[in-house]
């Protein structure tokens, strides 16, 4: 692909992708959107440069297996392809039919490999056939939790408008200017050789942005794949660079330098001192430091109590994310919507706010309560069996 894109464009796109504060921030954690972004960019280039049908289909199948929102990308790319096909005039039906006949085998192979790839994961290697039915069903029956509705311009505000928060400036304006420069050249009178590719990605970005802006459920990580496409599009600002005027060359070089430097500075803030701070625009409902410290603390507790086990660990209530991720190294962890009768026998208990009072009463004689913060505005109560707590206090009285 580097040979097709051009060395300079590929290098700039890679730098913008690697330095993007949005992508850097969410690459630090397990979240489906980063896999979707990886497979999505691969699928986009496979479509653009007509990779073998099986490779293209596999990339799309991996997107399907990762997240149901892959249909937005598939629709955007299909629409972009159709618009480019019809950009000069409406082709005759005979041309469309001939085009279909020419590519029908490739289309069938790509569709088959996409479905087989997705089915492999959704059916647990074809052992649970119903999984594929549920995968298709979720596209049409989609529920979201409350509190995430945002206005139409949420993503424009997040990326295009400079905002000062937490002592740092947050903006993606230089990158958007580079992408706009690439579009102006591609749609202009002297387009570069990669003009059709640039137009395809530009239309894709606009359709992705429109789709995600119309959907009321919004958060930063949903923009990972569209923003990755913006980074690639911005890289194409260097396409046909040698044929540009001196003023245009100076503009592109200056904006590219500003984009790379400012993105790097924002990324350092995003994953540094503001990693779990709600003033970081990418730290959406961030996890509190209390919970980030929980796993290492529990492991220390296990070390100083070799004759006892800190498992099973019980989590009581709903809305407990990211506890499953934090407690992933503890195999014997259970989740209950309501406190079970044998709760007092469990060494470690975490209770969500709606059950904290009831659990505190049930464990009053056996456990030490320790208030903690889970996410912004969401407390959680940690209960530790008293003998374990006494061991810890003797080990570390601070």
Show which residues each predicted segment covers.
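Transmembrane-helix signature of polytopic, membrane-embedded enzymes
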Residues: 1-19, 51-55
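Transmembrane alpha-helical segments
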Residues: 1-4, 39-47, 75-82, 179-183, ...
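Specific aromatic-rich, kink-prone transmembrane helix
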Residues: 16, 25, 35-52, 59, ...
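Short acidic/glycine- and proline-prone juxtamembrane loop motifs at membrane-interface regions
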Residues: 22, 28-33, 69, 219
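Transmembrane-lumen/periplasm boundary regions of multi-pass, lipid-linked membrane glycan transferases
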Residues: 25, 58, 64-198, 206-216, ...
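Hydrophobic alpha-helical membrane segments of integral membrane proteins
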Residues: 35-36, 55, 72-73, 222-226
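Short periplasmic/luminal acceptor-recognition loop of GT-C membrane glycosyltransferases, typified by
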Residues: 56, 284-285, 289-335, 339-341, ...
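Aromatic/acidic, Gly/Pro-rich catalytic loop(s) in extracytoplasmic/lumenal soluble domains
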Residues: 344-398
């Amino acid at each position: 692909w580097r040979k097709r894109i051009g060395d300079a464009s590929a290098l700039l796109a890679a730098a913008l992708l690697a330095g993007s504060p949005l992508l850097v921030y969410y690459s630090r954690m397990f979240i489906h959107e980063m896999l979707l972004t990886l497979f999505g960019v691969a699928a986009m280039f496979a479509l653009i440069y007509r990779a073998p049908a099986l490779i293209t289909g596999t990339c799309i199948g991996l997107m399907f297996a990762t997240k149901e929102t892959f249909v937005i990308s598939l629709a955007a790319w299909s629409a972009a392809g159709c618009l480019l096909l019809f950009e000069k005039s409406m082709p005759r039906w005979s041309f469309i039919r001939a085009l279909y006949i020419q590519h029908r085998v490739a289309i069938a192979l790509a569709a088959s490999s996409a479905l087989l790839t997705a089915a492999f994961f959704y059916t647990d290697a074809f052992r649970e056939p119903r999984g594929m039915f549920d995968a298709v069903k979720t596209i049409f029956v989609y529920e979201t939790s409350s509190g995430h509705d945002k206005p139409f311009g949420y993503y424009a505000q997040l990326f295009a408008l400079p905002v000062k928060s937490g002592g740092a400036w947050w903006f993606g304006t230089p990158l958007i200017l580079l992408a706009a420069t690439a579009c102006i050249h591609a749609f202009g009178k002297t387009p570069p050789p990669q003009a059709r590719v640039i137009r395809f990605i530009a239309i894709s970005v606009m359709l992705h942005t429109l789709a995600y802006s119309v959907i009321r459920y919004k958060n930063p990580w949903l923009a990972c794949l569209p923003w990755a496409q913006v980074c690639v599009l911005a890289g194409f600002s260097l396409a046909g660079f040698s044929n540009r005027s001196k003023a245009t060359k100076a503009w592109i070089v200056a904006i590219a330098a500003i984009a790379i430097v400012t993105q790097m500075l924002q990324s350092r803030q995003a994953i540094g001192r503001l990693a779990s701070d709600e003033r970081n625009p990418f730290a959406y409902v961030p996890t509190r430091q209390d919970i980030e410290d929980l796993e290492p603390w529990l492991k220390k507790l296990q070390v100083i109590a070799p004759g006892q086990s800190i498992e099973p660990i019980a989590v009581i209530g709903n809305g407990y994310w990211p506890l499953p991720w934090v407690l992933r190294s503890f195999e014997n962890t259970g989740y209950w919507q309501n406190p079970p009768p044998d709760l007092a026998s469990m060494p470690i208990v975490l209770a969500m706010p709606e059950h904290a009072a009831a659990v505190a009463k049930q464990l009053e004689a056996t456990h030490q309560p320790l208030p903690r913060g889970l996410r912004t505005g969401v407390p959680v109560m940690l209960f530790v069996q008293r003998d374990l707590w006494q061991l810890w206090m003797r080990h570390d009285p601070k």
